[in-house]
Amino acid sequence: MDWNIENGYFANGVKIIAGTDEAGRGPLCGPVVAGACILPAGIELPYLNDSKKLTEKRREALYTLITEQAVSWAVAEATPEEIDTLNILNASQLAMRRAVAMLTPQPELTLVDGNVARDFPMSAVTLVGGDGLSPSIAAASILAKVTRDRALVALDAEYPELRLAKHKGYPTKEHYAALNAYIDAHGGEIPPIYRLSFLKNLHRE
């Protein structure tokens, strides 16, 4: 992946650029997780790309490289409760702002994947498909995806009946069936890890 986007800003005098992206907007449960990353300018990381286009093994390998070689990196989340209160778009923005706020040094410019950048305390530029165009955003997307997948594997150990390690919380038929079975077995209780605003398609009999 080339550095054309970042290089354009470097050429105009910007010295510190971060990328940020989120993972987990679509699942029924768990947090939405954001990554933020400042990479050394021009660094080449093998196979760096949009995290969704990489195998799990390659994401894990890149996660290690990124965390070892980044100038600064961070991950943050918004909880299911925050998602239900704010909506998923606003919660995703909140998670990204939290992640960027944890970076040291603070960036002069943040490249934000997507078409929305709300309330960032520094200059922020949106980039649709940025995780496939900007190394800074691609690195952030990998940090977010790996962190969220690990969180769902941990939740799987807590709720083995839901098989979260397999579907990572996404709305599959198997997930809906497992959730219905869990609710039936627990007196109508929905686990607190769920985003209640996402359960409109949960058909109870």
Regions found by a protein language model. Name each.
Residues 1-205:
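RNase H-like, Mg2+-dependent phosphodiesterase core
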